[in-house]
Regions:
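Flanking scaffold residues of small Cys/His-coordinated metal-binding clusters
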Residues: 1-4, 60, 95-99
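Short, cysteine/histidine-rich loop/knuckle motifs that typically chelate Zn2+
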Residues: 7-8, 65-69, 106
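Cysteine-rich micro-motifs
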Residues: 1-13
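Short, non-ligating residues that shape and space the ligands of small metal-coordination modules
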Residues: 11, 15, 74-79, 113
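Histidine-centered nuclease catalytic patch
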Residues: 64-100
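Polybasic, low-complexity binding patches
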Residues: 29-30, 88-99, 109-145
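Short flanking/linker segments adjacent to small metal-binding domains or redox-active Cys/His motifs
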Residues: 137-167
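Short, charged surface segments at domain edges that flank catalytic/cofactor-binding sites
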Residues: 26-64, 142-145
Length: 167
């Protein structure tokens, strides 16, 4: 049985079939790559989305650097999402929104977070009670891959909503 009527139709049908096969191949490759991701990779991706949300939250609110109080450069890559209690010393607070705020790269990286000024401005922003609760929080939190996937999707969606509502 003939499936095409002419040479032109055969060429078109062949191109269409190849495009469909390539699309299916990309889909299966993407699924295989997702399965190969380690917990560490998921942690990095979740942290990236969380940090993006924090920067967007503080940009929309019009906040400056949490340490210096200066206006931040939102146009380039000069703003970090700085943690009050560092991820190294308090990994259980890495996804805590009270623990993370927009901060200049200078304060975050070269002044080691400028913790004294960070704390003073954090008290102004969220209050002494919440800062003390943050400092006292030693509850261990262990994130498995499914938790990290959920965190990544949650903050990706929240950042998208903030950006859409701000526009």
């Amino acid at each position: 049985m003939q499936s095409v009527c002419s040479l032109d139709c055969a060429i078109h049908s062949s191109k269409k079939a190849r495009a469909w096969a390539a699309k299916e191949d990309r889909k299966t490759t993407r699924v295989k790559l997702e399965k190969l991701k380690t917990r560490s990779t998921w942690m990095k991706e979740a942290q990236r989305e969380f940090n993006r949300y924090i920067r967007e939250r503080d940009r929309v609110a019009g906040f400056g650097c949490i340490s210096s109080g200066r206006a931040l450069d939102w146009s380039g890559n000069a703003t970090d999402a700085g943690h009050f209690r560092s991820v190294g010393s308090a990994p259980h607070l890495r996804f805590n929104e009270d623990n993370c705020h927009a901060q200049s790269k200078h304060a975050n990286r070269y002044l080691s977070g400028d913790a004294v000024n960070y704390r003073m401005r954090l008290i102004e922003r969220i209050g002494l009670e919440r800062v003390e609760a943050l400092e006292a929080d030693q509850t261990p939190r262990h994130y498995d891959i499914s938790d990290l996937k959920a965190i990544k999707e949650k903050y990706k969606k929240m950042a998208r909503e903030l950006k859409k509502n701000a526009a």
